């Protein structure tokens, strides 16, 4: 499936996009021909900016081939979005989170001054350290949920602990959403439906 998404947003604090000795963030000639796009080149934050902004001011940086936040984000700051708008997509990313960390990947967010945070307009794939978060979590707040909306079967997904790499994927196909964590389906729903 070709990537075509409406702005993604990420919340700090968070480490995103895996890097090891394998060359990541590259496309094969076939993937290029099929229309796939990279959202991160492994070296720069080109293609990203602050939510409702024209440039990227932080707290994000590239460290050893990964996008990382400095941990200074808050509920009202630290959100970055893609420069390009998309519609339907298949997005896969590797990530790890710091001990006690809380973050998320939001999509189809609306950028307008009256919406200073992305979670009031777009669904959030929750990324959080369930074990070490400072406050007790409700099921709708746990890692892998469609935040405050749809819950996975927590018995069928495995989230690696803080500091270890996980892989997540979201497929958005004409309003039908399927999410995955480490190869296991977490949630499936229809966006903008009466239930949603």
Please annotate each region the language model reported.
Residues 1-24:
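Bacterial Sec-dependent N-terminal signal peptides
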Residues 19-196:
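Carbohydrate-interacting regions of secretory-pathway proteins
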